[in-house]
Amino acid sequence: LSLLGFEPNEDFEHLVKESRGRRLSQASPDSSLLLTKSINATPHGGGQRMKMNSQEYRIMRRWIEQGMMPGKADDPRVVEIKVVPEQRRMRPASEQQIAVIALYSDGQQQDVTAAVQFESNDTEMADVTKRGIVSIKSLAGEVAVMARFQGQVALFRASVPILEGENQWPEPTNPIDAAVIAQLKSLNIPISNVCDDNTFLRRVTLDLTGQLPTLAEIKQFGSNPSAGKRSEWIEYLLSSENYAEHFANKWMLILRNRRDTPGQKAGSFAFHRWIREQIANNRPFDEFVRDIVAASGAIDVHPPVVWYRQVADTFSRLEDTSQLFLGQRIQCARCHHHPFEKWAQKDYFQMASFFSQVKTKPGQSPDETIVFTSMGAPRASHPKTGESLKPAGLDGPVIEDSDRRDPREALVDWMVDKQNRFFAKSISNRYWKHFMGRGLVEPEDDMRVTNPPSNPELLDALADQLTHSNYDLKALIRSICNSRVYQLDTEPNGENLRDRKCNSRHYPKRLGAEEILDSVDQFTATSTAFDSMPANTRAAALPDSSFRSYFLTVFGRPEGTTACECERSNESTLAQSLHFANSKELIAKLGEANALPQILSKSTSSHGENIGEVYLRAFSRLPSENELQSALAYIDKKENKQEAYQDLVWAILNCKEFLFNH
């Protein structure tokens, strides 16, 4: 049967006519396989789906008994469902019965609660029964319950405040803080204090450049008496080469910049260089996207053509474009109605027709690809109806003039139109997750009505800022990094310990694989060699995803085979712990002649000063008194001071504080 019954006409053919109608018996309805399997009287893989004499059973039995008639074309159809109530403020450990009303094409309304599928978007906050009873647990926050019936979806939203205590919140001075603080007030969740300067310095430097602050930068920042020195530091980082390198790496991987043959090296290197230049020059994001999606010509003339080498067919081009730049995972609609969204196959193939005229041909070398658009009207054929479909954006009008120009240009025009919220919300959410560790929508590229943002007002504010700045990514970054919310401490203050998505405090996040390797090299004063790359090349500066490194692999660097950032793993694993504890690679780094342990063992500074330098290099802070005395005691009792410093550096590398941005 079709997924969730989205293709009733096909289901009717299978049930009633296929295999000589053996699944149904009008003469003996109760012996019909459809019913005996549903109640598990006839064993099958699906198990029991209903009970005998239940409402569902009686409806199906009556239909069989009455002759299994198909529906008529003019039968009333469900055009919308509504949840009652739509939202409610609830206490912890409380319940709410929700009802679902179906609105039909002939104007009638019907309570369909008993036939609806319900699903909670956060089972740690709330569960929901098959009959629509929502059970709130003990966590404060906001939770949504999805209701789905005959291709329609609706949401019930519950806000669960903390009941005890009277909290104080600062006055917001920008739209980001205003949206977050308003939500925290409504939920009575206290907000943490702003972090200290050293924490901010390490956090923002890692987030913007992917590397630790240097000793010189720590001194430069610390000696700045200006009240606005945090904003000044953000500007300093945004103008650095490491900023462009770090974000070029981010985009290079999800744009699938990889090489499958040695001959593709020049193209992948050129594409990376192009991405890096666009970021360094702060190219408006809409123009950046246009150059990729509408790329034509040869790689040496227009490097974004490389993207078409990996997305080699119409479907992958459509799906990557939707996921990367619109936050829409539309893949499901290729074969059937999307189970969690309103997109039908027609929506999918109307989008696909934008790419229907894209062709490729070999260039001067076997590994070179030339992309061009052939003449003719862009069309896609609906796989079930055979209808010839003109290009149209999701929820957008049919593009009538797409046969008079490159249809992809028309697609980008629709995408970047400021009235089209998909584009601005998608990139805003993606960048929010980069800095805050969690998207307002999770996963960050799966934005749909059944996966609502944790703070809709904040997502709107970010998208508004982006469109008003004409898609200026540096302006978006400035807004986020200068906000009080970004600069909050990770330390909870009682009741916000369990908050995971309201941004009442900063959430620590494990560094990415490239950040960890680059931080190890920077901290230990060593470097990692990569095949065919110049000495001292950072992992974040590798031009494509095809460089082999066990370290990067074990810490979750993606191979660039999909457009999904979920290909990257930032989870901590046993293999990572073992690698840090026993890796010959790390041990060799600590033993290099010019590595940090050797520098410190030969230093004329006191051991206390050396220990302070170690902590500054790793954590951008001086050691606490306990940390200092513990390290001094160890170094004093060790005869071989070089080994003592090797042990100290090794111990720091194995600290969670080193591996996390906090």
Show which residues each predicted segment covers.
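Periplasmic/extracellular electron-transfer cofactor-ligation site
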Residues: 1-12, 62, 66-74, 329-344, ...
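Solvent-exposed helix-loop boundary motif
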Residues: 1-57, 74-101, 106-173, 203, ...
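Active-site rim elements
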Residues: 20-21, 45-51, 262, 506-507, ...
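Catalytic cores of secreted or luminal carbohydrate-active enzymes
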Residues: 36, 50-70, 575-586, 590-592
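Short helix C-cap/helix-to-loop transition motifs enriched in small/turn-promoting residues
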Residues: 70, 151-155, 227-228, 299
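Extracytoplasmic
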Residues: 95, 113, 327, 346, ...
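Long, His/Glu/Asp-enriched segments that create or flank divalent metal/ion-associated functional microenvironments
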Residues: 524-541, 545, 551-581
